[in-house]
């Protein structure tokens, strides 16, 4: 609203929007009285009808499924453009980019004065070393995120919980630790986050609820429990919660001793790179690149002709050649034999 002309009607639609406001916004959208709308998953609902949807922007696109993205863009018909934004593209997205269905712009530069985040891995048995490091950071007036996968202790899953970790840390750093998770009321969450922003607390023990949408420049350490249980894109997003100020930021991945080989590879990828595209490429090699013709986000497809992992340069060259032909060639009759073969082939079974 601060950027755009005041004459442009801009609205927000989320779970917090009250019933009366929702009805008004939905009606105004349909009547073309709202020109720009910001929203959560609430926008995907069938009752949300746009008068003339021309442009969809999906931020943190890895949080949305393929069907959801298509459902939203389809609300605009054939004239709707789609912009996806993500720090870590998921494998299927990367593959579609290689195939030319998406144009990609890469912003590799960091904002001024930001340093690369240093990522370490530590075994759970080395918790004393981690606590010692945290104590030093707090003494230097820095703040810490401590992320756990569960809210409460589970008998079925051997994962760290925020309640247990909060209790542990509160004894070591009394009065300096705050607790945050999804079951806390929204108003209370905002109070906790504001108190952390204003440095009332030095440690915030949280679930992955902090993954997106927060910016605390003074927080320069994040510790992630059971890090091997998270996907690479989520770990990369969590790590991005720190390193937003001028000081050196650190990410510590807490691990069990009995890691699988695949888990070790994923952890090493994260330790070796802060580049979202590099991470997504390595993730694609590990998990597969998704079902190009369907809705699967990952999983290996056995290409007999070529595949995006090993033949990326070939696909990029082919895309350039197609664009050249479209622009320069007036007589395409010489390509008819190739087109005939394509038409006759069972393209899905012959190539995939």
Where is each model-derived feature located?
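Inter-lobe coupling/hinge segments of SF2-like helicase ATPases
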Residues: 1-268
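Accessory helical-bundle/CTD segments and flexible terminal tails appended to RecA-like ATPase motors
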Residues: 194-203, 210-217, 222-225, 240, ...
